Design a protein with these regions (language model features):
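Conserved catalytic cysteine-centered active-site region
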Residues: 38-57, 84-134
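Conserved "HGTGT" condensation-loop signature of ketosynthase/thiolase-family condensing enzymes
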Residues: 1-78, 102
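Short glycine-rich or small-residue beta-strand-to-loop segments that form or flank ligand, phosphate
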Residues: 78-84
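Conserved beta-strand segments that form the floor/walls of ligand-binding pockets within enzyme
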Residues: 8, 81, 111
């Protein structure tokens, strides 16, 4: 009997920009306060990209970290899906930029834009690709 392939997460990679923008920083150029922002959003600070950084450059670093964690190389990649609500451009997709940066040639690469739920959709799509052997 044929056992279907099962998807599993075998490596993790993450990165955030080093530059931090606090509510106090925002108070300097907007008519607002730390308390007002905190009360409505719960946010104290956020990480923002610096010159030369983008969704793709950060994604490439995260992908390399995930590959290292899984003890894999870009040659082991069969599919690249990027879930983002902040692509740096419409074309080429962020996934294709990361694919190029990794040197992962000849594999499908595409973006999913579904805001906060994008990760769940990307995980589901990736799982179906794996389970169907495509």
């Amino acid at each position: 009997m044929h056992r279907p392939l099962r998807a599993a997460i075998i490596g993790l990679g993450a990165v955030v920009p080093e530059k931090v923008l606090t509510n106090a920083d925002i108070e300097k150029f907007l008519d607002t306060s730390d308390g007002w922002i905190m009360q409505r959003t719960g946010i104290r600070q956020r990480h923002v990209v610096s010159e030369g950084q983008s969704t793709a450059t950060l994604g490439t670093i995260a992908a390399k970290n995930a590959l290292a964690d899984a003890k894999l190389t870009p040659r082991d990649i069969d599919l690249i899906i990027v879930a983002t609500a902040s692509p740096e451009m419409l074309l080429p997709s962020t996934a294709c930029c990361i694919q190029n940066d990794l040197g992962a040639k000849d594999v499908p690469a595409f973006d999913i834009g579904a805001a906060c739920s994008g990760f769940i959709y990307a995980l589901s799509v990736a799982s179906k690709f794996i389970e169907t052997g495509t």
